């Protein structure tokens, strides 16, 4: 059996909001598999899927660029090791220059950027290495995407840690900005229920079925419970199904219809999203927090 460490219990508690002993027991039953343990706890507690915020550990910036005509744009994430470097002007400018380069070269594969020249003539890789020497931290170009809009593009950057690019048609620039801001706040998975990944939906359906079975109700009632939860889940994770953040009385879908507008696609980047937190000594962390509170 895999060893269940304090840091594993801590991470599961952060993901689920449940008690230490419940988390430790679930990890033991799941053989140390974090995802399986989370699913076990969801079945028992009826909880929703976690936002996995506890796993976001990297520093860096999200930068973006859109051409004046709104037809081309790019979004990029560049990582560093500390918040201090993430606020450095040279680092921020480097990320901005990369976004512009992606647009001018129509590049989405960031691996192709390395040997491309920036405005000053130096290659991306040589500038990156020079920044590493100057700032004393590893700097990596994590991901990026370039757009050729079907309609036109809107972008929203929340500080430099969250970035959204939306391809939409109809409405005006203010609507595009509002939709991008909504996506940053509500973090939908996709535009419509038809775009929800099949494996993700099936996984949630299995969880809902197991949760409903815990009620001990007849099969026909369980089936209705599951379908109700699936419908609610689809509304929560799709852009069109979500209540609009600036007016929760209407959904985004209703807002778009009143403006004769449509959203064809969007990209949402959050700095460090999906990067696993480094294992820390849980006891040492607790002691550090106690010392700081004195």
Curated annotation (Swiss-Prot):
CDD domains according to UniProt: UBA_EF-Ts (cd14275)
UniProt GO molecular function: translation elongation factor activity
Subcellular location: Cytoplasm
Involved in Mg(2+) ion dislocation from EF-Tu, as annotated region: 82-85
Keywords tagged on the record: Cytoplasm, Elongation factor, Protein biosynthesis
Top-level taxon of origin: Bacteria
GO CC terms, sorted: cytoplasm
Keyword Electron transport attributed: no
Record InterPro entries: EF-Ts_dimer_sf, Transl_elong_EFTs/EF1B, Transl_elong_EFTs/EF1B_dimer, Transl_elong_Ts_CS, UBA-like_sf
Signal peptide extent: none
Family (UniProt): Belongs to the EF-Ts family.
Role played: Associates with the EF-Tu.GDP complex and induces the exchange of GDP to GTP. It remains bound to the aminoacyl-tRNA.EF-Tu.GTP complex up to the GTP hydrolysis stage on the ribosome.
Name the record gives this protein: Elongation factor Ts
Organism: Nitrosomonas eutropha (strain DSM 101675 / C91 / Nm57)
Gene: tsf
């Amino acid at each position: 059996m895999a060893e269940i460490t304090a840091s594993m219990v801590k991470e599961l508690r952060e993901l689920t909001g449940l008690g230490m002993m419940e988390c430790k027991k679930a990890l033991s039953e799941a053989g140390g598999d974090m995802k399986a343990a989370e699913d076990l706890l969801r079945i028992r507690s009826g909880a929703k899927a976690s936002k996995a915020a506890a796993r976001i550990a990297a520093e860096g910036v999200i930068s973006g660029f859109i051409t004046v005509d709104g037809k081309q744009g790019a979004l990029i994430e560049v990582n560093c090791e500390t918040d201090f470097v993430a606020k450095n002007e040279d680092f921020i400018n480097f990320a901005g220059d990369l976004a512009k380069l992606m647009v001018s070269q129509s590049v989405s594969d960031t691996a192709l950027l390395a040997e491309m020249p920036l405005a000053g003539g130096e290659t991306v890789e040589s500038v990156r290495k020079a920044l590493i020497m100057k700032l004393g931290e590893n700097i990596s170009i994590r991901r990026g995407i370039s757009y050729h809009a079907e309609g036109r593009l809107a972008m929203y950057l929340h500080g430099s840690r969250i970035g959204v690019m939306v391809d939409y048609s109809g409405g005006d620039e203010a609507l595009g900005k509002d939709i991008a801001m909504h996506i940053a706040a509500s973090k939908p998975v996709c535009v419509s229920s038809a775009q929800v990944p099949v494996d993700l939906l099936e996984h949630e359906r299995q969880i809902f079925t197991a949760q409903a079975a815990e009620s001990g109700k007849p099969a026909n009632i369980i089936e209705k419970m599951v379908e109700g939860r699936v419908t609610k889940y689809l509304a929560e994770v799709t852009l069109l199904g979500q209540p609009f953040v600036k007016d929760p009385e209407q959904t985004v879908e209703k807002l778009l219809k009143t403006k004769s507008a449509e959203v064809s696609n969007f990209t949402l980047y959050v700095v460090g999203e999906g990067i696993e937190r480094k294992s820390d000594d849980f006891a040492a962390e607790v002691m550090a927090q106690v010392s700081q509170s004195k």
